Design a protein with these regions (language model features):
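Contiguous beta-strand/loop segments that form the cofactor/metal-binding neighborhood of enzyme cores
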Residues: 1-124, 128-151, 160-164, 177-185
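Hydrophobic, well-ordered secondary-structure elements that form the walls
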Residues: 153, 170
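Hinge/cleft segment of the Venus flytrap/periplasmic-binding protein
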Residues: 174
């Protein structure tokens, strides 16, 4: 949400969300439910992309190799009121970091970046996201102004609930009329 809310016109609200897990994930990828070009652009920014082949190499994995590395992938696809489609992919076993890719009007190539979130090594401890949150709460108390749009919390919470509902109901499309009015710049 943080990246796409900065587009011209800002956040416009969300119409629907659908989850895909396991075999449904791979079928949706094959069917073009989300952009393979953008997925690859995001994966190419990863600092933790697993190598599918032994040896000293840096070969981008094929879909078949991704399936071997990523046993339980999850995708959440949702459409904004202005028609923008967003997809969040969770591909544990293939990547351990947070990456973003988008088509930008006027650019031939996708924009992609890594969102560096300092994560500890696997199975050691939890990342400390609480201290930055408390810092932002403190700034809000001191200035009387939130450090980010509070509507973002409403939108992301609503998307999480819709994602859980979609998964629980058999990966169906969930209409999110309650999120259509969540608009901000």
């Amino acid at each position: 949400t943080g990246m796409v809310e900065r587009r011209k016109g800002g956040e416009s609200g969300v119409k629907w969300l659908q989850a895909y897990r396991g075999d449904a994930f791979w079928q949706a990828l094959s069917d073009g439910v989300w952009s393979r070009e953008l997925m690859d652009a995001g994966l190419s920014r990863s600092h933790t992309l697993s190598q599918a082949r032994p040896g000293f190499n840096n070969v981008f994995p094929t879909v078949g190799e991704m399936k071997q590395l990523c046993k339980d992938p999850v995708a959440y696809v949702y459409e904004h009121i202005d028609g923008l489609q967003s997809t969040m992919l969770m591909m544990s076993g293939l990547v351990e970091d947070f990456n973003f890719a988008a088509h930008i009007k006027g650019r031939d190539e996708p924009l992609s970046t890594q969102m560096y979130l300092p994560m500890p090594a696997a199975r050691t401890t939890l990342a400390n996201f609480f201290s930055p949150l408390v810092n932002n709460v403190e700034k809000m108390f001191l200035t009387g102004k939130p450090t980010y749009p509070v509507e973002r919390t409403l939108l992301t919470s609503g998307l999480v609930i819709a994602g859980v509902d979609s998964m629980h109901q058999g990966q169906v499309k969930i209409e999110t009329s309650h999120l259509e009015a969540v608009q901000y710049q």
